[in-house]
């Protein structure tokens, strides 16, 4: 952490001299430190290598044990802008979409459940951050007898592509997709400046030019020129860097039901052997060190140390909410909402349909309905041709959902969206493709639908460990309000249960599954249930509007009748067992009543619990990787959840004690100011034009007007200690009435059950 090993970034149009003035106090008088260690290059292999490794499996049944296989190649050093960009394009060509040739071959082989690798789901970031580039492709959910066949399929498919050639339309689509991404420079919630810093680091940290990764126009033009003079440019890359490259690793992950117990036993053995060798003095030193660690964990930072951290003051914050311009065209044919914002010549289109048009029992299909629309082809073209057209003529079209509570109602706002973007000059193509997808879908391809369902099931199963806290939190809240209940049906643990059953139904009762999809489409895709939300420059609207109205007019008139759902809320405590060494512990409830004046302080309280009480008790002392408190202002739900947590009962006790912590809270002015600033920072979260347009639409649908937003901002800015102390009583409701959902190992769940007494937790297997 010596300054000699640091890199300093500034983003903005501020004077350079001012930047040096900011740095000077931190660097003056600091002596140079040791030189930064260099990351050495990997020694090249003379021949490919195969490695087999075990991983923990929950089931001992052979039919339930799924293998995974990956084939990876080490590529040249990441110091050639043209090669780096061309490698990203090649990865997208091979794996970037379900219609990409290598990904398609793996999917259609039927030998696995889900594809992974470089380029899948835009997974190109890590590749660019390493000193040497790489490419990998793999399949998971494989039967043991098919492992070698999967490796052969990957190598044979690449060989066939190098020899027979890659479809030129696929190449054009991928080149356009990568170019659109580079020119749009849209990274969602990540500020552009931060992304630019990260890009610069990809070369700078290895001693290269930090500006090199930022200049993409020259290598992009060079690649386009090469494709004209050398049409088989990518086939040549494929042959040179993959097929003829001996630096290849085949990694086979083999399920082992005993692996977890072997790990634990090995650890216990190592501890016993180490303890046996310790002298009494060494034991005493370990004891004293442990006690000192505990003291440090329990000792708050001194005011003097905290004062060293630079911070804003309340006067630095904007007092008024930031508003987003919205123009509404209501002509009796359905709403068209337009957000005039500068978008650099891009139109963002959100075409939405009200899910309340459907009976509740069909909602779980929305785990796969959007993908079925876009990835099964249409009456005019198969899904490969459809994917090529989307890639070549647009910046992408994706399915999305907006699920939210709304002010003044127990009903949710639940919408299905097609979200697309294109250069304004291609807006006609964007809406023509959308019309084709919405009016001419093909749901009758049984094998393709089965592949989509298998992939979604595998995606959810793979997310259990990295995103377990989100799944547990959502399942807790699904017992209390409609919006969370809908989310649980379409993208939660309940959705995983549905997808597992759906695979069997596709095999055994295909006509009924097909009928369900057709019924969903008939009821949902209707003019009366539609909402068009557009974002672009005001001057571009005359070129876009005719295409919007044309698509709206083409939608069927029948369907779209709104239904009221009656959710069957499950509020019992649940334990969900998975093969893991850590737990995810959730607890929460819907508060009986939250006074309107408390919404602002509730945001402060949840933020404060995250950075103080939960940080200290659950993370520092309890050993969890993370813990959070959340508050939903629409439903009044308050919930806690932990991440990668070795505890269960201890964590629940910390949650229950949060109310006393708030009651006794006495923050000094500086600490209270920091908490307020943190909440305002989230209220004023960074948004690019597409996100602004979607956020404005969401606010209008849910009743979160600018007036309501201003009231809550005023509450946040004026929060005092007594406001937070009064919330202790509300948090008592969570302690006394909260629902508990825990995901973790069978052993940990049973231990928690025994510690707290029988029958407080119903345990069932999840994985």
Question: Model-flagged regions — what are they?
Answer:
Residues 1, 16-34, 164, 244-247, ...:
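Extended, regular secondary-structure scaffolds
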Residues 1-26, 513-548, 736-737:
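Non-catalytic, conformational "gating/processing" segments within enzyme and secreted inhibitor domains
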Residues 5-11, 65-76, 104-226, 246-256, ...:
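M16 family metallopeptidases and their MPP-like homologs
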Residues 21-27, 150-155, 432-434, 545-551, ...:
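Short amphipathic alpha-helices in soluble, non-transmembrane regions
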Residues 35-105, 136, 191-214, 275-374, ...:
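His/Glu-based metal-binding/catalytic segments typifying zinc-dependent metallopeptidases
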Residues 56-59, 121-127, 221-225, 236-241, ...:
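Generic recognition of flexible, low-complexity loop/linker segments
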Residues 229, 233-240, 280:
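Extended alpha-helical coiled-coil "stalk/arm" regions that scaffold and mediate dimerization/assembly
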Residues 718-767:
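In a subset of proteins, long, contiguous C-terminal domains/tails are tracked
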């Amino acid at each position: 952490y010596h300054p000699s090993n640091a890199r300093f970034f500034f983003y903005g149009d501020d004077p350079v001299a001012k930047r040096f003035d900011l740095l000077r106090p931190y660097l003056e008088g600091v002596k140079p430190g040791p030189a930064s260690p260099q990351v050495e290059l990997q020694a090249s292999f003379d021949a490919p290598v195969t490695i087999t490794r075990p991983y923990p499996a929950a089931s001992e049944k052979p039919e339930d044990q799924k293998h995974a296989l990956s084939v990876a190649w080490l590529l040249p050093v990441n110091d050639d802008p043209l090669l780096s960009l061309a490698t990203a394009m090649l990865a997208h060509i091979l794996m970037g979409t379900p219609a990409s040739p290598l990904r398609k071959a793996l999917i259609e082989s039927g030998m696995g459940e889900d594809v992974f690798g470089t380029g899948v789901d835009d997974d190109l970031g890590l590749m660019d951050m390493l000193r040497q580039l790489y490419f990998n492709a793999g399949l998971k959910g494989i039967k043991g007898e098919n492992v070698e066949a999967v490796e052969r399929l990957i190598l044979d498919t690449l060989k066939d592509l190098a020899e027979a050639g890659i479809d030129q339309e696929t190449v054009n689509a991928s080149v356009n997709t990568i170019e659109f991404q580079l020119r749009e420079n849209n990274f969602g919630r990540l500020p552009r400046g931060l992304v630019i810093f990260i890009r610069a680091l990809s070369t700078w940290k290895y001693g290269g030019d930090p500006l090199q990764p930022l200049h993409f126009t020259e290598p992009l033009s060079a690649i386009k020129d090469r494709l004209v003079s050398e049409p088989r440019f990518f086939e040549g890359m494929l042959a040179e860097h993959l097929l003829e490259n001996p630096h290849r690793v085949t990694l086979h992950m083999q399920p082992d039901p005993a692996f977890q117990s072997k790990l634990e036993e090995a650890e216990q053995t190592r501890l016993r052997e180490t303890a046996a060798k310790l002298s009494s003095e060494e034991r005493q030193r370990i004891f004293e060190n442990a006690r000192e660690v505990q003291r440090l964990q329990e000792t708050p930072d001194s005011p003097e140390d905290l004062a060293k951290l630079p911070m804003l003051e309340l006067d630095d914050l904007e007092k008024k909410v930031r508003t987003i311009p919205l123009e509404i065209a209501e002509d009796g044919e359905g709403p068209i909402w337009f957000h005039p914002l500068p978008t650099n010549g891009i139109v963002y289109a959100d075409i939405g349909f009200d899910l309340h048009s459907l009976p509740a029992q069909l909602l779980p299909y929305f785990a796969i309905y959007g993908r079925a629309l876009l990835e099964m082809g249409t009456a005019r073209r198969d899904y490969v041709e459809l994917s090529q057209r989307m890639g070549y003529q647009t910046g992408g079209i994706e399915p999305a959902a907006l699920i939210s509570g709304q002010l003044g109602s127990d009903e949710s706002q639940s919408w299905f969206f097609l979200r697309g973007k294109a250069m304004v000059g291609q807006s006609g193509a964007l809406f023509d493709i959308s019309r084709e997808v919405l009016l001419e879908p093909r749901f009758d391809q049984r094998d393709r639908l089965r592949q989509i369902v298998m992939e979604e099931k595998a995606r959810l199963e793979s997310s259990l460990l990295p995103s377990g806290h989100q799944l547990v939190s959502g399942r807790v809240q699904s017992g209390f309000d409609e919006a969370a209940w809908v989310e649980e049906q379409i993208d939660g643990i309940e959705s995983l249960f549905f997808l597992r059953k759906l695979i069997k139904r596709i095999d055994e009762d295909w006509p009924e599954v097909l009928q369900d999809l057709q019924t969903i489409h008939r009821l949902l895709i209707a003019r009366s249930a539609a909402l068009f939300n557009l974002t672009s420059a005001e001057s571009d609207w005359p070129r876009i509007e005719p295409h919007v109205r044309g698509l709206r007019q083409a939608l069927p008139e029948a369907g779209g009748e709104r239904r009221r759902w009656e959710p069957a809320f499950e509020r019992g405590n649940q334990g969900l067992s998975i093969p893991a060494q850590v737990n995810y512990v959730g607890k929460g409830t819907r508060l009986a009543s939250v006074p309107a004046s408390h919404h602002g302080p509730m945001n402060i309280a949840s933020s404060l619990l995250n950075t103080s009480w939960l940080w200290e008790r659950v993370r520092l002392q309890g050993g969890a990787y993370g813990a959070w408190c959340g508050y939903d202002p629409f439903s009044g739900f308050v919930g806690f959840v932990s991440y990668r947590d070795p505890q269960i009962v201890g964590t629940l006790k910390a949650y229950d004690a949060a109310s006393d912590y708030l009651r006794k809270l006495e923050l000094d002015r500086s600490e209270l100011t920091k908490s307020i600033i943190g909440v305002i920072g989230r209220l004023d979260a960074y948004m690019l034009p597409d996100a602004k347009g979607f956020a404005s639409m969401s606010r209008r649908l849910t009743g979160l007007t600018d007036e309501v937003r201003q009231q809550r901002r005023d509450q946040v800015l004026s929060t005092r200690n007594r406001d937070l102390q009064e919330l202790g009583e509300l948090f008592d409701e969570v302690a006394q009435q909260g629902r508990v959902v825990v995901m973790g190992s069978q052993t940990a769940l049973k231990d928690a059950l025994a510690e707290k007494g029988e029958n407080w937790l119903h345990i069932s297997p999840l994985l």
